[in-house]
Amino acid sequence: MELNTLKSTFINNFGKEPTSLFFSPGRINLIGEHIDYNGGFVFPCPITLGTFAAASLREDRICRAYSLNFESLGVIEFSLDDLSYKKEDNWTNYLKGVLKVLIEKGYKIDKGIDLVINGNLPNGAGLSSSASLEMLIVKILDTFFSLNISKVDAALIGKEVENTYIGVNSGIMDQFAISLGEKDKAILLDCNSLYYEYVPLNLGDNSIIIMNTNKRRELADSKYNERRKECDDSLDTLKKYTNISSLCELTSLEFETYKDKIEDSNKLRRCVHAISENERVKDAVKALKENNLELFGQLMNQSHISLRDDYEVTGKELDTLAENAWKQPGVLGARMTGAGFGGCAIAIVNNAHVDEFIKNVGQAYKDAIGYEASFYVASIGNGPTEL
């Protein structure tokens, strides 16, 4: 049991029982990929895999932190008086980053904490282990220091840590999906305005299967920033002809009028993906509300094809998973999720076919790629909570 391991590790390292236990989920995005930074709608939900913590407040200004995921690093110690980024401090830079941003915003944090964490999200798999950790830390500090941070502000704080302290140019989706997570609901989020709406995820006799390629992807040094630049360049071109502030403000029909202004064929395809994907999100949410799971699944498939052909962020591993998933009985739809270039895909599969699905897709993947994929049946959980 994870919580017992967490407690005993805390006692072994710090010589006392932790006062509190916490959990923060990871996330999957059901549809709406690579458009959070293009002003589009996304449709993520929190999952029951995530990051657990045991924590206690200290009486001095020292923080001590230990991760069961990085045991070789041992206990990492630092003071509230020096919260500068240090590469050797590894994962605890997320703790330091959250502390630094909160203190700079005027929140009163005058004591250190002892912390042990243990995550069961596969690292680098695109299930937002870093956002899960950020939202976990905000929750712990909010609880210990009675900071009254709203869920939306918590997400914005996490994004600020990611962008300004860690140095990853990510959007708001991951932190938002986790911070505002509610059981059995997905969140339709407009990344421009932060308008959001909860949509019950009624999947009937079907489950969401997460398929991990086990090919690590690193957001910062993948082609993520290259795609962002291609979209930003295209937007700059289009702004000369139409009054928009983001690509996803255009419909496919409107884009037809202006598409010849974008001379680079790669950039043109990136625009086609962003604009069509935004429309797919709206159609998918409508389908879900009308209980049309078949259409929802078809839109997932179309999303993957667009990410493969127009946005070019899938790669052999993700394509092997998705394309083999489409052939299986009982499958409504399948697509990559997250930034791509490795990481995970998801499928919606009829419960009666889940075992067969995992066996067949797993075998096809191993035959094609040479190593195994991992499969998880996902449940949609709550946002960060004290246990």
UniProtKB/Swiss-Prot annotation:
It is found in: Cytoplasm. This is Galactokinase. ATP binds at residues 67, 124-130. Its EC number is 2.7.1.6. Pfam families: GalKase_gal_bdg, GHMP_kinases_C, GHMP_kinases_N. InterPro entries: Galactokinase, Galactokinase_bac, Galactokinase_CS, GalKase_N, GHMP_kinase_C_dom, GHMP_kinase_C_sf, GHMP_kinase_N_dom, GHMP_knse_ATP-bd_CS. Mg(2+) binds at residues 130, 162. Belongs to the GHMP kinase family. GalK subfamily.
